From Swiss-Prot:
<feature type="compositionally biased region" description="Low complexity">
    <location>
        <begin position="400"/>
        <end position="409"/>
    </location>
</feature>
<feature type="compositionally biased region" description="Basic residues">
    <location>
        <begin position="48"/>
        <end position="58"/>
    </location>
</feature>
<dbReference type="InterPro" id="IPR011112">
    <property type="entry name" value="Rho-like_N"/>
</dbReference>
<feature type="compositionally biased region" description="Basic and acidic residues">
    <location>
        <begin position="305"/>
        <end position="314"/>
    </location>
</feature>
<feature type="compositionally biased region" description="Basic and acidic residues">
    <location>
        <begin position="237"/>
        <end position="252"/>
    </location>
</feature>
<feature type="compositionally biased region" description="Basic and acidic residues">
    <location>
        <begin position="170"/>
        <end position="184"/>
    </location>
</feature>
<feature type="compositionally biased region" description="Basic residues">
    <location>
        <begin position="117"/>
        <end position="132"/>
    </location>
</feature>
<feature type="region of interest" description="Disordered">
    <location>
        <begin position="30"/>
        <end position="155"/>
    </location>
</feature>
<feature type="compositionally biased region" description="Basic and acidic residues">
    <location>
        <begin position="390"/>
        <end position="399"/>
    </location>
</feature>
<feature type="region of interest" description="Disordered">
    <location>
        <begin position="169"/>
        <end position="327"/>
    </location>
</feature>
<protein>
    <recommendedName>
        <fullName>Uncharacterized protein 032R</fullName>
    </recommendedName>
</protein>
<feature type="compositionally biased region" description="Basic and acidic residues">
    <location>
        <begin position="433"/>
        <end position="474"/>
    </location>
</feature>
<feature type="compositionally biased region" description="Basic and acidic residues">
    <location>
        <begin position="30"/>
        <end position="39"/>
    </location>
</feature>
<dbReference type="GO" id="GO:0006353">
    <property type="term" value="P:DNA-templated transcription termination"/>
</dbReference>
<dbReference type="Pfam" id="PF07498">
    <property type="entry name" value="Rho_N"/>
</dbReference>
<feature type="compositionally biased region" description="Basic residues">
    <location>
        <begin position="195"/>
        <end position="227"/>
    </location>
</feature>
<feature type="region of interest" description="Disordered">
    <location>
        <begin position="376"/>
        <end position="474"/>
    </location>
</feature>
Length: 629
């Protein structure tokens, strides 16, 4: 009784493809077929596909190096020949069944593919069974497939058979190369295409195609081999190098996103319906609602958001305070996947409902980076780090106030550090619970009397304590308020540790003043133009004011009513009240640097305006302006 190993050796010598994966019975059958077929083959190269021995179950045609899900239970390490590559003919004109008894011919030593003697044989039909049966594969041998799609799903060999039968040339006219499946399909479906009688096409070497992958996903992407071997002199088997499988293509050989074009083949991009490319009705409100951003974003792995300490005492700067315990340096934030448009904006004072996204200038970035502010227990105060200083902070007073506050805080933290309990837990909310008054008193107290702070250490620690109970939106403090907040970030913020950023877009050439008369942006506005999604709508009055104030180094107090700029205030309150009766007198009394013509025009304007009964403030203002006040 022949062992599998012997059968394998025989099969190898005969050059049967796929022998290393076959079971014993299959091997015997293949060897038996072998002689019969080869005679028939040599006799008529154009044999009808009906006779083609596609029965031989050649297993999966993958390099046998990867034991992917190999069928063969008995796989001997000897069978190292990778069947899909070897261009060895399945038939060679060797003794037919007699061949089975010749394991003697192949000494066990020479099992490496480079040595196998009869591997290339003059006639060759690359027989392969399609890895999975597609419904199309059940067609009868002769007839041509019903539709292009079915055609493309057929195994290559099947196409080759049909083409041969229809008398279609298997090699391209342009270069002698074998046609790709798509080309074959086109020809087959296009009717019994141009029967160009060519001289027997020269044997083209096997293609090294990068797409050969350990587990073939679909029959469509099978590596291209020249479909028909025409008898030609035996070449030395050593020429054939093992193709390098490029590491870049993993087993998703045809990833949909950007298939690397194979040589000479057009790339077909196909997107399946339900992946990110759905541009539905949602495009009209790009950033509204909590939906994901509708254009495909690259997915990144997301870690759990760390808690990050942030010093928000002075809103637009970082302080220079050198106190170790004071702040914790923010670790570098890795790229996180951007999921939701932002909800909280440090710029708006009102607590905003969950779904609301401010469209205004200052929040433009904040609604892309969404931030949740939450207070956290104080264990983390322990791991101090030297605070980064921000060079933009040029404001001495701010820095000093903050530093003094920080030092005081550090001192009392040190004075209490006897027990391990975190400092903040120690005490209930302070008696003086009115934030406003305390905030106004603070900077002076912190600078002037650090001693009192040591005497009564709980005083400014206890305020964040109140927030631990019910975390609410962070309100920014003026410089001295000793208030270190913690907030949890799930998205990267670009710079520094402070979630405040000047608005992306300030109206271009406009002077400061006209900002004042801009109508407020409505809270929620679903009717936005496309353009406004890119250029955010104009910032609200309050945002603008705060923005300029912050750069002037003033503190922005959340609660205070909107104030005019200083010079406006002068304009409004220091101007003597006008009455129409004294107007002419006033004009005549005015220094003569104003030429009478101009005064005249001013007067005319005044008449016209008051005739329209527009409100006096506007009139007054325009007059003052015209008179060069």
């Amino acid at each position: 009784m022949v062992t599998v190993t012997e059968l394998r050796a025989t099969a190898k010598n005969l050059g049967i493809r796929g022998y290393s994966t076959m079971r014993k019975a299959e091997l015997e059958e293949a060897i038996r077929d072998h002689g019969r077929v080869s005679e028939a083959r040599v006799a008529s190269p154009r044999r009808s596909p009906a006779r083609s021995p596609r029965k031989s179950p050649a297993g999966r045609k993958s390099p046998s190096k990867s034991p992917a899900g190999r069928k063969s239970p008995s796989k001997s390490p000897a069978g190292r020949k990778s069947p899909s590559k070897s261009p060895a003919g399945r038939k060679s004109p060797s003794k037919s069944p007699a061949g089975r008894k010749s394991p003697s011919k192949s000494p066990a030593g020479r099992k490496s593919p480079s040595k196998s003697p009869v591997r290339k044989s003059p006639s060759k039909s690359p027989v392969r069974k399609s890895p999975r049966k597609s419904p199309a594969a059940k067609l009868q041998a002769g007839d041509r497939p019903a539709s292009m799609n079915i055609c493309k799903n057929l195994p290559k060999q099947r196409l080759v058979d049909i083409a041969t039968e229809m008398g279609i040339d298997l090699n391209r006219e342009s270069d002698g190369k074998p046609k790709t499946k798509d080309q074959l399909c086109a020809d087959i479906m296009g009717g019994a295409g141009r029967k160009s009688p060519r001289k027997s096409p020269s044997r083209s070497p096997v293609r090294k195609s990068p797409s050969r992958s350990p587990v073939r996903k679909s029959p469509v992407r099978s590596p291209r081999k020249s479909p028909v071997r025409v008898p030609s002199p035996v070449r030395s088997p050593v020429k054939e190098k093992t193709p390098v499988r490029s590491p870049a293509r993993s087993e998703d050989a045809g990833s949909d996103l950007a298939p690397r074009p194979r040589r000479g083949k057009a790339v077909r991009l196909d997107y399946d319906e339900d992946d990110d490319y759905s541009y539905g009705a949602s495009t009209d409100n790009l950033f509204s609602g909590n939906k994901e951003i509708p254009f495909p974003t690259r997915k990144r792995r997301t870690r759990k958001p760390e808690k990050v300490f942030v010093d928000v005492r002075s809103p637009h700067t970082l302080t220079d305070s050198e106190d170790e315990d004071d702040m914790v340096e923010v670790p570098e934030l890795e790229d996180k996947e951007i999921t939701m448009p932002g909800v909280l904006s440090p710029y708006s004072d009102e607590i905003v409902e969950r779904g609301y996204v401010s469209q205004g200038g200052a929040d433009y970035i904040n609604y892309i980076y969404r931030t949740e502010y939450a207070l956290e227990s104080d264990e983390s105060f322990a791991r101090g780090a030297r605070p980064k200083t921000n060079k933009r902070d040029s404001d001495r007073a701010v820095r000093e106030a903050a530093a003094a506050a920080a030092i005081a805080r550090a001192l009392d933290r040190r004075s209490q550090s006897g027990n391990d309990e975190p400092a903040v837990r120690r005490r209930s909310a302070p008696t003086d619970s009115s934030r406003e008054s305390r905030r106004d008193r603070e900077p002076q107290r912190d600078i002037a009397e650090p001693q009192r702070d040591i005497a009564e250490p709980q005083r400014d620690i206890a305020e964040p304590q109140r927030d631990i109970a019910e975390p609410r939106k962070v309100r920014f403090r003026e410089a001295g308020s000793a208030d270190v907040r913690v907030f949890e970030r799930d998205e990267p913020k670009e710079y520094g540790r402070v979630p405040v950023r000047p608005p992306l877009f300030m109206p271009a050439g406009e002077p400061l003043q006209p900002l004042k008369f801009r109508p407020k942006t409505p809270k929620i506005d679903d009717t936005i133009h496309r353009a406004q999604m890119v250029l955010p709508s104009k910032p609200s009055q309050k945002e603008t004011d705060n923005y300029y104030k912050q750069f002037a180094g003033e503190a922005v107090r959340p609660s205070e009513p909107v104030q005019w700029d200083k010079d406006d205030q002068v304009l409004y309150h220091k101007v003597p009240a006008w009455d129409d009766s004294s107007y002419a007198a006033a004009v005549s009394a005015w220094p003569m640097s104003v030429d009478p013509k101009q005064a005249e025009s001013v007067f005319a304007e005044f008449e016209q305006l008051s005739a329209q009964d527009s409100d006096l403030i506007k009139v007054r203002k325009s007059i003052m302006k015209a008179l060069g006040y």
